[in-house]
Structures are given as C-alpha cells and as structure tokens.
C-alpha cells in the first residue's frame, strides 16, 4: 500500500485564469471519481503562486513552486515520510527536476504510457 499525494503548480490562480475555489472544486470531483473506482488521493498540495502573477495576493516567488522542493518538504514533514520512501511521478520536466532537487527517484509519465508499465517501474524503484 502506498500513500498518494498530488503536488501541483497552479499558476493559473496567480494569473487570474481561474480561482482557488475552482481548483478545489476540481480536486473534490477528482477525489469523488477516484473513490467510485476504489482509489483516493491522501492529500492535495498546491502552489498558487507565480512571480509574474496578475493577482497581488498570489504574486510571489514561492519555494513551493516546482522545481523547488517546498511541497515535497511539507509532504515529508506532515506525514512523517522519509525520502527513501518517496517517489515522484510527474508529466513535466519541472516535476522531474523537483524530484532531483529533493534527492528522490522519479518517473516521467505523459498519460499515454501503459499503466502496467508504470506500475512495474514503481515496483522496481520502491524495492
């Protein structure tokens, strides 16, 4: 069994493209769909900040924004998870760079790859 977290950059909030409440609604619906299929996300972590944002409250060069490691540090601290028990699966280069910066393994997944191959890779890495 694994704990599953989402650590996501959400610059669209800082840029005024959508509201933080919209993102929370999306995460809520995602969680509902996962639960219908016997899965779940243990916790969502997000960075709504961007140095070039248009919304003053979110215009910030945050240490949480990947490829920086702030969100991973929070996950590790909040849940008492050691780095040797962490793996990051991401679809962007900034995700993979974040994992490197935090000294944990990573897998780049574009959503089109075979899920069985992904789970095989997870098993190999976490052994």
For each feature predicted by the language model, list its residue ranges.
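Active-site neighborhood of HAD-like aspartate-dependent phosphohydrolases
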Residues: 1-3, 36
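Short beta-strand segments at enzyme active-site cores
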Residues: 3-9, 42-47
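Asp-based, Mg2+/Mn2+-dependent phosphohydrolase catalytic module
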Residues: 20-43, 52-88, 92-127
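A short acidic, glycine/proline-enriched capping/turn motif at secondary-structure boundaries
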Residues: 12-13, 48-53
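A short secondary-structure junction motif
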Residues: 10-23
């Amino acid at each position: 069994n694994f704990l599953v977290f989402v650590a996501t950059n959400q610059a669209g909030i800082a840029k005024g493209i959508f509201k933080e409440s919209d993102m929370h609604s999306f995460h809520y619906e995602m969680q509902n769909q996962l639960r219908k299929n016997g899965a779940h996300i243990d916790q969502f972590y997000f960075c709504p900040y961007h140095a070039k944002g248009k919304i003053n409250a979110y215009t910030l060069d945050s240490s949480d924004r990947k490829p920086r490691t702030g969100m991973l540090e929070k996950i590790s601290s909040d849940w008492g998870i050691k780095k040797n028990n962490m793996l990051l699966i991401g679809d962007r280069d900034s995700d993979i760079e974040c994992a490197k910066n935090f000294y944990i393994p990573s897998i780049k997944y574009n959503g089109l790859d075979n899920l069985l191959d992904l789970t095989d890779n997870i098993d190999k890495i976490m052994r």
